[in-house]
C-alpha cells in the first residue's frame, strides 16, 4: 500500500475540499486517463484495488501511471472510548482529490481495452469518474466521453 516514508507532522487537520483541481488535470504520461468528477478522500487501499483491477485486465500489457499519492493521515480513536483525551492515532492514509484531477493514466493498449480497464478501476473508487483521452498537440480534445 502507498504511504509516505516519513512526514513532518504525524497528525494533520481535516481541511476542506473546495474548488476544482488546477494541477494534475490533464493526461500527460499515457494516452488515456481516469478523471474525477467529485471531491473525495481516496484511501491507499482503494488506489491499490483500482490498480490491481486495471493491471489484471490489461494482462501486464501496456503501462499504468498512478497520478495521486495518499499523503494525508486520517486518525481514529479506539472503539468505545470516551470523548476527549486527545486526538486518535493515525489509522490510514488518503489522497485528497478534487474534481478534474486525473487519477490514473494508461498507455500501450487500444482505446477499447483502456476504456474497459479504467471502467473496472472506476468501480473500485468511491466517486464518479470519466474516461478522458490525451489532448492532441493542436490544443483540442482528441476524444472525451
Swiss-Prot record:
Record field: compositional bias (Basic residues): 1-17
Keyword presence, RNA-binding: yes
Keyword RNA-binding annotated: yes
SUPFAM superfamilies, sorted: Ribosomal protein L16p/L10e
PROSITE patterns membership: RIBOSOMAL_L16_1, RIBOSOMAL_L16_2
One annotated GO molecular function: tRNA binding
Entry keyword set: Ribonucleoprotein, Ribosomal protein, RNA-binding, rRNA-binding, tRNA-binding
Region annotation Disordered: where it falls in the sequence: 1-20
GO CC annotation: cytosolic large ribosomal subunit
Protein origin, superkingdom: Bacteria
GO-annotated biological processes: translation
Subunit structure and binding partners: Part of the 50S ribosomal subunit.
Similarity comment: Belongs to the universal ribosomal protein uL16 family.
Described function: Binds 23S rRNA and is also seen to make contacts with the A and possibly P site tRNAs.
Protein name: Large ribosomal subunit protein uL16
Native organism: Acetivibrio thermocellus (strain ATCC 27405 / DSM 1237 / JCM 9322 / NBRC 103400 / NCIMB 10682 / NRRL B-4536 / VPI 7372) (Clostridium thermocellum)
Primary gene name: rplP
Amino acid at each position: 500500500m502507498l504511504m509516505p516514508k516519513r512526514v513532518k507532522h504525524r497528525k494533520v487537520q481535516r481541511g476542506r475540499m473546495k474548488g476544482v483541481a488546477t494541477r494534475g488535470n490533464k493526461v500527460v504520461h499515457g494516452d488515456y486517463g481516469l478523471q474525477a468528477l467529485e471531491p473525495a478522500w481516496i484511501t491507499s487501499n482503494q488506489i491499490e484495488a483500482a490498480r490491481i483491477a486495471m493491471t489484471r485486465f490489461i494482462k501486464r500489457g501496456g503501462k499504468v501511471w498512478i497520478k495521486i499519492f495518499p499523503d494525508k493521515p486520517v486518525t481514529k480513536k479506539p472503539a468505545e472510548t470516551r470523548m476527549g483525551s486527545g486526538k486518535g492515532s493515525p489509522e490510514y492514509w488518503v489522497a485528497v482529490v478534487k474534481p478534474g484531477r486525473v487519477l490514473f493514466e494508461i498507455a500501450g493498449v487500444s482505446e477499447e481495452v483502456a476504456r474497459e480497464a479504467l471502467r473496472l478501476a472506476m468501480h473500485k473508487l468511491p466517486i464518479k469518474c470519466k474516461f478522458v483521452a490525451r489532448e492532441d498537440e493542436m490544443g483540442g480534445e482528441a476524444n472525451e466521453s
